[in-house]
Amino acid sequence: MRHIICHGGVITEEMAASLLDQLIEEVLADNLPPPSHFEPPTLHELYDLDVTAPEDPNEEAVSQIFPDSVMLAVQEGIDLLTFPPAPGSPEPPHLSRQPEQPEQRALGPVSMPNLVPEVIDLTCHEAGFPPSDDEDEEGEEFVLDYVEHPGHGCRSCHYHRRNTGDPDIMCSLCYMRTCGMFVYSPVSEPEPEPEPEPEPARPTRRPKMAPAILRRPTSPVSRECNSSTDSCDSGPSNTPPEIHPVVPLCPIKPVAVRVGGRRQAVECIEDLLNEPGQPLDLSCKRPRP
């Protein structure tokens, strides 16, 4: 870019326009992106952001200017009005405050104690829970083992042999591999099947019979003779009527009577005050006059 010397310190309008055109052509011509509509970043663009910044070449210099002692003094609330020691002074990895040391370095109105390294013991010396009696009694736990030769060198078989005392016993896996059979636990007894509920009895229909007829009672003057005994009975019959299979001619049929709830018919009101001589018959109605 060429240098333009302005005489008198005045830049005209034509000179300013030429300077801007020259700036655009020489500086921004190659890196100028094409104009485009602004679009917000997508979720993938926000998720794939690269937050790993390159190493700062000034990080070491800044760390020397502001050592750990200054940062610790700021945390402790100590005002430092002067600069810390010159760069290059080594700082220990861990600093602790020891006010009992009389030697102090004046950094301003408020003195800051000297910081010396201290080894911190991070070992936990607290006693844990005491072991319970159950853990001692359990001993070795059962572990299912798979060996090349079933029953030889198997930890599962050794566990069962040690607990049972039988030297020839094998675990279920070795027994299955040797005999080709599975080991099943004892089968429990089958549950009793519920008894089927009895079906409700259906009402049986009675066989149809010939209609029963009532025999007309004999009058006081009639006489009936029994052919089997050759005896005759006189007077009204007190026995129930007999049932005959043959229907006689002109039988007496009962007539349905409607029961009424009206009071007894009286001639005058005084009849209601007197006690009735016979029970009130409500089966029939007296016809109206």
Swiss-Prot record:
A zinc finger (unnamed) spans 154-174. Residues 41-49 are annotated as: Interaction with RB1 in competition with E2F1. A motif (LXCXE motif, interaction with host RB1 and TMEM173/STING) lies at residues 122-126. It is found in: Host nucleus. A motif (Bipartite nuclear localization signal) lies at residues 258-289. Residues 219-237 have a biased composition (Polar residues). A motif (PXLXP motif, interaction with host ZMYND11) lies at residues 113-117. GO terms for biological process: positive regulation of cell population proliferation; positive regulation of protein sumoylation; regulation by virus of viral protein levels in host cell; regulation of DNA-templated transcription; regulation of protein localization; symbiont-mediated perturbation of host cell cycle G1/S transition checkpoint; symbiont-mediated perturbation of host ubiquitin-like protein modification; symbiont-mediated suppression of host gene expression. GO terms for cellular component: host cell nucleus. Changing residue 253 to E: Reduces interaction with human ZBED1. It comes from the Viruses. InterPro entries: Aden_E1A. Changing residue 123 to H: Abolishes increased sumoylation of human ZBED1. Residues 76-140 are annotated as: Interaction with UBE2I. It holds the Pfam family Adeno_E1A. Changing residue 157 to S: Loss of transactivation. Residues 82-107, 186-240 are annotated as: Disordered. Keywords: Activator, Early protein, Eukaryotic host gene expression shutoff by virus, Eukaryotic host transcription shutoff by virus, G1/S host cell cycle checkpoint dysregulation by virus, Host gene expression shutoff by virus, Host nucleus, Host-virus interaction, Inhibition of eukaryotic host transcription initiation by virus, Inhibition of host innate immune response by virus, Inhibition of host interferon signaling pathway by virus, Inhibition of host STAT1 by virus, Interferon antiviral system evasion, Metal-binding, Modulation of host cell cycle by virus, Modulation of host E3 ubiquitin ligases by virus, Modulation of host ubiquitin pathway by virus, Oncogene, Phosphoprotein, Transcription, Transcription regulation, Viral immunoevasion, Zinc, Zinc-finger. A motif (PXDLS motif, CTBP-binding) lies at residues 279-283. Plays a role in viral genome replication by driving entry of quiescent cells into the cell cycle. Stimulation of progression from G1 to S phase allows the virus to efficiently use the cellular DNA replicating machinery to achieve viral genome replication. E1A protein has both transforming and trans-activating activities. Induces the disassembly of the E2F1 transcription factor from RB1 by direct competition for the same binding site on RB1, with subsequent transcriptional activation of E2F1-regulated S-phase genes and of the E2 region of the adenoviral genome. This is Early E1A protein.
